[in-house]
Amino acid sequence: MSIQLITFDLDDTLWDVTPVMQDAEAALRNWLAMHAPRLGAVPVEHLWSIRATLLQAEPMLKHRLSELRRRILLHALTDAGYAHADAQALAEAGFQVFLAARHQVELFAEVHPTLEALANRFQLGVITNGNADVRRLGLADYFQ
């Protein structure tokens, strides 16, 4: 039996995720400051409290990070006094800002040559609980 398929996680495998997430969080905070001023400088402890409450009610959200982030934003915006429909629109728009910044990654130097060499011999796949998209990253041609 020979190896036919190799799968990869993305974060911290193909790039260092810490600076990416820090930048994405900063982009979201800056966007929220401009577009949702009632939210103000919400204490991070409040966001962690919302997160804990959501995960207690729906433990499977820990595997659906995009949905979890959207819901945290929605709750924080609602708590800040935005009407539900406005909070939903702001949460989704803010999430899209976060997601765009989250795809501004700096691949490790050896990623392209390694994936190219492996893709010539094996099927390559991605298994991740994150929200990085190989199509948005210009890596889709390596994966099936």
Model-predicted regions and their roles:
Residues 1-2, 120:
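Residue-level preference for short coil/turn positions at secondary-structure junctions
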Residues 89-104, 111-143:
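Substrate-recognition element of Asp-dependent hydrolases with the DxDx(T/V) motif
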Residues 2-108:
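N-terminal helical cap/lid subdomain that shapes the substrate entry/recognition surface
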